[in-house]
């Protein structure tokens, strides 16, 4: 059996409960895909987006809904080794990627205040724009369960507000475009287990400023949240699930003030 088929099989069989069912539940629970959609799956080269690409291929192949996929990779200024690693992994996993270039790393190079935040915002715009050029109406990103709960805690502790990462949202700058996060219910631990099971190696941090194709060493507020959640989990093993559910069970009668943003 070819390696990419073994990788596909592992998602459906070995990790059916941990990954596949949660992936399908996320799509269904949050109504992410409709018939006739043309979705650009955005690949950064990391484990999350590469798993997302395979899951999207599988649901297109075996699902009952008719929709189209494109697999896009934005090169913001990767070093040659990082770029080649993405290409090699895409070939191993039988993912037909389209690569386009941008100069984001050059733009944010001299910015000291929140360069990662600015880089992420700029990436989003480039991805939307390229997806539109491919006649797509949605982009799919690889954010997972842990990203969601980390974002929720970060908003409370560093921004003084309650805000979570949404499973889908309409773009305010690109008319007719929507962002979806199909791995919304999948836990990072299970993604890492899937990577180890298949003996795969993905980029951990492709930022030029680390210049390391295997290890992303940059600390961040998100890393602080990971450590905090890990400690809290020692007290209660369901703490992460409770944080996640808190955004689904907000009682406005117990909230002093709230705002509504109209997209």
Residue ranges of model-derived segments:
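ATP-dependent adenylation/nucleotidyltransferase module used to activate substrates
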Residues: 2-154, 158-161, 166, 189-197
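A structural signal for well-ordered alpha-helical scaffolds and beta->alpha junctions
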Residues: 16, 20, 83, 124, ...
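Catalytic subdomain that performs nucleotidyl-dependent activation
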Residues: 68-69, 147-228
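Short, solvent-exposed coil/turn elements at secondary-structure transition points
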Residues: 75-77, 103-105, 171, 185, ...
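A short glycine-/small-residue-rich loop at the edge of a beta-strand within enzyme catalytic domains
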Residues: 118, 140, 182, 186, ...
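Short, basic, helix/turn surface patches
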Residues: 122-134, 168-174, 227-246
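The feature marks non-catalytic terminal segments
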Residues: 200-263
């Amino acid at each position: 059996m070819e390696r990419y088929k073994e990788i596909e099989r592992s998602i459906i069989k070995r990790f059916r409960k941990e990954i596949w069912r949660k992936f399908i539940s996320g799509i269904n629970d949050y109504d992410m895909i409709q018939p006739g959609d043309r979705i650009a799956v955005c690949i950064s080269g990391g484990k999350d987006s590469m798993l997302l690409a395979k899951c999207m291929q599988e649901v297109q192949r075996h699902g009952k809904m008719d929709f189209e996929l494109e697999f896009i990779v934005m090169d913001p200024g990767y070093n040659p080794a990082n770029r080649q690693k993405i290409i090699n992994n895409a070939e191993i996993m039988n993912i037909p990627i389209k690569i386009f270039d941008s100069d984001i790393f050059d733009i944010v190079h001299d910015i000291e205040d929140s360069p990662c935040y600015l880089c992420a915002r700029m990436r989003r715009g480039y991805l939307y724009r390229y997806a539109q050029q491919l006649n797509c109406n949605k982009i799919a990103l690889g954010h997972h369960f842990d990203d969601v709960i980390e974002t929720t805690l970060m908003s409370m502790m560093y921004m003084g507000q309650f805000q979570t990462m949404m499973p889908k949202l309409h773009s305010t700058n690109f008319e007719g475009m929507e962002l979806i996060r199909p791995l919304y219910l999948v836990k990072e631990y299970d993604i890492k287990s899937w990577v180890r099971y298949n003996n795969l190696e993905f980029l951990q941090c492709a930022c030029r400023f680390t210049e390391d194709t295997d290890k992303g060493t940059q600390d961040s507020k998100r890393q602080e949240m990971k450590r905090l959640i890990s400690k809290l989990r020692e007290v209660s093993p369901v703490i992460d699930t409770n944080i996640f559910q808190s955004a689904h069970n907000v009682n406005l009668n117990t909230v002093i003030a709230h705002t509504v943003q109209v997209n």
